[in-house]
């Protein structure tokens, strides 16, 4: 995964996917290509209409509109109800399991209520919820969840029948984990100015 929103640049991303798939390109099967999105509903709908057997990963972060809108402004444009309809359509046409990326923010989206909201959102979808502990960034007001929070949250998800995995943390101690490198680059650029 990289920075940027692929579905905001749909035409170019489709050109890239076509090249990646072509035998005279990189020759990678569509089934091994994943498009990650923050949840741009129009782009998901367009992707559905193409019937490409690519995988889809959606940064969900929260399954409650108020919480998701507070950490992901895209949710104010495309609330969860619209996102879910688009995902159902995508899954109906592509018959692929969807990955929901769920960055765990300490004390914000790791509660029992959050787990129940997540279970409700995933009902009727074939998904894998990829739980990702937040990597601390000095300039942002979020904290990593405590181990006890993660255990309680995953225990609740398990009891609710939510299919999940926990991403193994890499690079956190060197400030080189997901999200941290961009933060360091921005900080470095500000210092130079």
Predicted regions and their residues:
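Conserved AdoMet/S-adenosylmethionine-binding subsite of the radical SAM
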Residues: 2-160, 164-165
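Radical SAM enzyme core and accessory elements
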Residues: 159, 169-193
């Amino acid at each position: 995964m990289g920075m940027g929103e692929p579905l905001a640049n749909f035409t170019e991303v489709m050109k890239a996917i076509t090249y990646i798939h072509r035998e005279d390109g990189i020759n990678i099967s569509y089934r091994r290509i994943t498009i990650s999105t923050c949840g741009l509903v129009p782009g998901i709908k367009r992707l559905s209409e193409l019937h490409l057997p690519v995988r889809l990963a959606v940064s969900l972060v929260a399954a409650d509109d108020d919480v998701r809108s507070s950490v992901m402004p895209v949710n104010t444009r495309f609330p969860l109800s619209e996102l879910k309809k688009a995902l159902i359509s995508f899954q109906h046409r592509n018959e692929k399991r969807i990955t929901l990326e769920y960055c765990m923010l300490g004390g914000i989206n790791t509660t029992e209520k959050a787990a129940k909201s997540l279970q409700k959102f995933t009902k009727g979808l074939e998904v894998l919820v990829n739980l990702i502990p937040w990597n601390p960034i000095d300039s942002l007001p979020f904290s990593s969840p405590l181990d006890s929070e993660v255990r309680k949250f995953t225990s609740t998800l398990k009891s609710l029948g939510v299919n999940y995995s926990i991403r193994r943390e890499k690079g956190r101690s060197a400030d080189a984990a997901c999200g941290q490198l961009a933060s360091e680059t921005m900080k470095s650029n500000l210092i130079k100015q």
